[in-house]
Amino acid sequence: MPNLKSIRDRIQSVKNTKKITEAMRLVAAARVRRAQEQVIATRPFADRLAQVLYGLQTRLRFEDVDLPLLKKREVKSVGLLVISGDRGLCGGYNTNVIRRAENRAKELKKEGLDYTFVIVGRKAEQYFRRREQPIDASYTGLEQIPTAEEANKIADELLSLFLSEKVDRIELVYTRFVSLVSSRPVIQTLLPLDTQGLEAADDEIFRLTTRGGQFEVERQTVTTQARPLPRDMIFEQDPVQILDSLLPLYLSNQLLRALQESAASELAARMTAMSNASDNAGELIKSLSLSYNKARQAAITQELLEVVGGAEALT
């Protein structure tokens, strides 16, 4: 019977594990919903900010505007902002974005450019520190749902790097949220800022829904049609000063959106990983139950044979 006991113990262990993975899946799903609500809540501000920036840019298009955040310099050094997670159990989320950042660093090195990392997330920080890569700053322990305060703190560090000319360009490496089962590490330039194209900026809002007992994502593309400011609008301050003050806010807003996308990607990856783990646990329980029943039947048959054999020996 020890074989039966070991199988029974293993079945119970797998059942307990399945309870944990199922709970983690539901928690991740709830947090994806919160991330979705945050994206929707911050969108009106982002829309209005883009419209004001476009209006100011249109008003100043014939003037010689020299703003540090818009000035493109000869690139000798690049800052790489990498957004990863603090925890594992989320499939290939962390591995994919770290590999993308590492490959980009190798490309810059081949081009003869210096680089330094600004890291968000414990996983990327541990990876690059073990490999003794240059890290200017790191941020760990951020909220599961990113906040504007966190985005502002990171943006201040990036502004310091760029304005001090320690780096001539800052690139963002993050994971773009596509669906619950798909995400894509992408790279975009954060600094110097480029406000071109704000007159028709396409954006997407994702909504977590259920269908047939399964979670799925609905995506809606929204177009922001920015309009020039009224010609008779009078500014108390110089429009150049207003634009200069709004550009850091625009940077923080771009960064917040990247943090939101990365958080949604991580949560979706964790939800998918835990769902797969729960399914695999269910299949393993079925297989172990079948093995247990076969072993139990074999044990009963053996006992019957022993009883019959003993009875025959007595006759």
From Swiss-Prot:
<dbReference type="GO" id="GO:0046933">
    <property type="term" value="F:proton-transporting ATP synthase activity, rotational mechanism"/>
</dbReference>
<keyword id="KW-0472">Membrane</keyword>
<keyword id="KW-0375">Hydrogen ion transport</keyword>
<keyword id="KW-0406">Ion transport</keyword>
<dbReference type="GO" id="GO:0031676">
    <property type="term" value="C:plasma membrane-derived thylakoid membrane"/>
</dbReference>
<dbReference type="InterPro" id="IPR023632">
    <property type="entry name" value="ATP_synth_F1_gsu_CS"/>
</dbReference>
<comment type="subunit">
    <text>F-type ATPases have 2 components, CF(1) - the catalytic core - and CF(0) - the membrane proton channel. CF(1) has five subunits: alpha(3), beta(3), gamma(1), delta(1), epsilon(1). CF(0) has three main subunits: a, b and c.</text>
</comment>
<keyword id="KW-0793">Thylakoid</keyword>
<keyword id="KW-0139">CF(1)</keyword>
<comment type="similarity">
    <text>Belongs to the ATPase gamma chain family.</text>
</comment>
<dbReference type="Pfam" id="PF00231">
    <property type="entry name" value="ATP-synt"/>
</dbReference>
<protein>
    <recommendedName>
        <fullName>ATP synthase gamma chain</fullName>
    </recommendedName>
</protein>
<keyword id="KW-0813">Transport</keyword>
<comment type="function">
    <text>Produces ATP from ADP in the presence of a proton gradient across the membrane. The gamma chain is believed to be important in regulating ATPase activity and the flow of protons through the CF(0) complex.</text>
</comment>
<dbReference type="InterPro" id="IPR000131">
    <property type="entry name" value="ATP_synth_F1_gsu"/>
</dbReference>
<dbReference type="InterPro" id="IPR035968">
    <property type="entry name" value="ATP_synth_F1_ATPase_gsu"/>
</dbReference>
<dbReference type="GO" id="GO:0005524">
    <property type="term" value="F:ATP binding"/>
</dbReference>
<keyword id="KW-0066">ATP synthesis</keyword>
<dbReference type="GO" id="GO:0045259">
    <property type="term" value="C:proton-transporting ATP synthase complex"/>
</dbReference>
